[in-house]
Amino acid sequence: SGEIAASRHYLHQHAELSFKEQETTAYLVEELEKMGIPVQKFDDYTGCIATIKGGRPGNRTVLLRADIDALPIQENSGVEFKSIHPGVMHACGHDCHAAMLLGAARLLWESREELAGTVKLLFQAAEEVFVGSHYYVDKGYLDDVDAAMGLHVWPTASSGRLVVMD
């Protein structure tokens, strides 16, 4: 959708390194709150968790996760939405992941009365340095999660194809 592409372009243009995703987090929180989705923010960490409670009975919680940090690489792509931060770019698809999760948030929120149980949406900081998830786990924010899923864009996979990894 156009909204997902616009979010991806914004996030790509405003790429931030691990633990420095303040502008990214603020953008995600603002977009989620505009939809009406409750969002948990953290005073001591970047990233956020949105929670969508279904309108039907159910006691399971599913987590959908997207990473939000960028890499310390100078962008020379020439695209009109290239990173405005010198030496920092989304070269691994995290802008796409976060934008797609925002799109999923909208769809889930709009159909929440049909959902049984709860869906948590984790916009995870600091994935590129392999420690970002520990914060959310160690603080107990994911204790009620029964199943978790993430995704990653894969440039060698054909468009429209789903690749599942073990």
Residue ranges, per PLM feature:
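Acidic/His- and Gly-rich active-site-bordering loop/insert found
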Residues: 1-90, 99, 103-115
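Histidine/acidic-residue-rich, glycine-tolerant segments that coordinate divalent metal ions
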Residues: 71, 79-89, 96, 113-166
